[in-house]
Amino acid sequence: MVLSGKDLTAYRNEDVLFQGLSFCLFPQQLMTITGPNGIGKSTLLRIIAGLFKAAEGHVSLKDQEQIYPVATACHYLGPQNAMKPFLSVIDNLQFWSAFYGQPLHSPHEVLADIGLSDLEHVPFNVLSTGQKRRIAIARLLLSYRPVWILDEPISGIDSYAQTLLTNIFQYHLNQGGMIIAATHSPLGIPENHKITLEKFLPPQEKIQ
């Protein structure tokens, strides 16, 4: 299975965010996307995930036999955590488990994986920033999807939790998964590809 983007271009209003951007990602590979805030990292992730349409170019996920829709083969983690604030942690994860179908792990199991089993009955909105992010990442473990598309996945995470998440990311890669992450901080595992978005600005903006 290969995930690729070819000559991607995106706009914000009338301004070009990036252009001519291509990549190719294979199983067990990590690709990071870097650049200052506002340059288009989140837009690129949403294009790859099938949430936005590129102004030019295309994204495909395929193997030797068929082409797959990226949206149904990926877990997308945006800057927001996609949890209902007044539901308990366990109720949120049970909702997502039912939504995904084909459960790989139970909500209780994924809470143990991220070291937060003792918070299962706590309302999501009273958690710390780092705890909320860990719960959001636990959601990815409920059902297997080969492609993880992550927007600042370790933002607000302390060093202990970063070690836990590094192990989770590495395990996903070892199982044949792929990860694309926009991040200001290293994920703690070797990256196979790195996209520096400044390199894909229009020529006049590169000069500035």
From Swiss-Prot:
Pfam families: ABC_tran
Localisation: Cell inner membrane
Keywords annotated in UniProt: ATP-binding, Cell inner membrane, Cell membrane, Cytochrome c-type biogenesis, Membrane, Nucleotide-binding, Translocase, Transport
Bilayer topology annotation: Peripheral membrane protein
Documented EC number(s): 7.6.2.5
Domain ABC transporter: from-to ranges: 3-206
The organism's place on the tree of life at top rank: Bacteria
SMART domains named in the record: AAA
GO cellular component, one term: plasma membrane
Binding site residues for ATP: G35, P36, N37, G38, I39, G40, K41, S42
InterPro entries in the record: AAA+_ATPase, ABC_transporter-like_ATP-bd, ABC_transptr_haem_export_CcmA, P-loop_NTPase
Record's catalysed reaction(s): heme b(in) + ATP + H2O = heme b(out) + ADP + phosphate + H(+)
One example of a Gene Ontology biological process annotation: cytochrome complex assembly
GO molecular function annotations of the record: ABC-type heme transporter activity; ATP binding; ATP hydrolysis activity
Entry's family note: Belongs to the ABC transporter superfamily. CcmA exporter (TC 3.A.1.107) family.
Protein task: Part of the ABC transporter complex CcmAB involved in the biogenesis of c-type cytochromes; once thought to export heme, this seems not to be the case, but its exact role is uncertain. Responsible for energy coupling to the transport system.
Assembly notes: The complex is composed of two ATP-binding proteins (CcmA) and two transmembrane proteins (CcmB).
The protein's name in its UniProt record: Cytochrome c biogenesis ATP-binding export protein CcmA
Species lineage: Bacteria, Pseudomonadati, Pseudomonadota, Alphaproteobacteria, Hyphomicrobiales
